[in-house]
Amino acid sequence: AKPRRTIRFMLWSGEEQGLLGSKAWVDQNPELLDKISAVFVYDGGPNAIAGLPATAAMKEDFETVFTPAMNLNPDLPFKLTDVDGIPRGIGSDHESFLARGVPGFFWTQEGRADTWHGIHTQFDTFDLVIPEYLEHSTTVIALTALGVGNLDGLLSREGMLEEGGGRRRGGGGGGRRLGVMLEGTTLAEVIPDSTAAKAGMKAGDKILKIGDEEVTDRRS
């Protein structure tokens, strides 16, 4: 099937050192950014792709794009999570694009793999791959690329970012990357193997305080 728009497969180096490769690309290609419908980063280990966040303005297009993924395998369900803005602070290469106003997404992944020992280390070897998860995830990615590429227009950027830029506490500098999707101060979703997951945080939990400071909104 030939898509209506170009689909690019891109590999980045220097993510762990500060998103060096993706930042360099967006800096060197500013004239292309307004033409990019969306960026999807697959870099979360061997578990199966299980979902994405969706803003209200994107929801209709995303329901069209992801209906095939939702019907792909009942044992590996896929869902869209309604959010006020695309979460930031995960620390992967889609954030280089979000910072320049391009919709960027990091897949939610679920499954039986314990990725913390291997991912992004010298222990990240082929024996950690789970074939059925990889086959499912690559199929979801292919369907997504084709679906977004065949939309009538670009994916909406209206209300794309979380209020205040959606950055993690502490601004662009310090602070730990929790790895959560927020609705207000409530955790809508917790990314597996993230700092939040390791701390025992779960979807539905509400952030009330950080240290001795009360949290009333995402800008607190």
Model-derived features with residue positions:
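Solvent-exposed, polar/charged alpha-helical surfaces in well-ordered, non-transmembrane soluble domains
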Residues: 23, 64, 68, 95, ...
